[in-house]
Amino acid sequence: LKFTGNGSEGGKPLDFTNSVGLEGTWFKDGKTLPVKLAAGGQSSVPASGRWYEMVTDESDAAFEAKAQGFYKAVLAGDKTGAAKYVDFPLRVNQNGKGHLVRSAAELSAQWDRIFTPAYLDILKKEMPHDMSVSKGQAMLGAGDVWFSSKGASALNLP
């Protein structure tokens, strides 16, 4: 098996901390089958009972409301609504390269290049609730969207 990434590793070698899963081939009795394992385990809840205490001082419900607001607006194609839940500049990563979207106007102008049907299909399978937390941010799915205390801060496109 080998580590798989989503482009956010910035050319660094993949390992358990920056990969989104493992892929490879399974061989047995002359049969060959593809194997794909996606990362997505849950973080443990801190002793305080606050899931997002490493991300924000606000309540978990308030933080998730922002993440869900972004998620619902994106899936609805609501550019203005989604921008309300973005922590600009927004980092957009794809194929090992990244760029910054610096404003709501830039997000609107780049919308169709960012929120492609393939990316939307990935997001539709995810749920912004009890998200994993790493390095002071919460991640949706396998790191497809990262949220800071102020809103969506990074997107990792397929």
Name each region found by the language model.
Residues K2-K12, G98-K150:
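Surface-exposed, charged secondary-structure patches
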Residues A62-A65, G69, G81, R102, ...:
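Extracytoplasmic/secreted proteins, especially bacterial periplasmic and envelope-associated proteins
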Residues K150-P158:
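Short, low-complexity, Pro/Ser/Thr/Gly-rich segments in the mature regions of secreted, periplasmic
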Residues Q42-K72:
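Short, low-complexity N-terminal intrinsically disordered segments enriched in polar/charged residues
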Residues D78-P89:
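Short, well-ordered alpha-helical segments enriched in acidic and aromatic residues
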Residues P89-R91, D144-V145:
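Solvent-exposed loop/turn segments at secondary-structure junctions
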Residues V74-D78, G96:
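Mid-length scaffold segments of soluble, non-membrane domains
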Residues L1-N18, E23-G40:
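Central antiparallel beta-sheet cores of small beta-barrel/beta-sandwich binding domains
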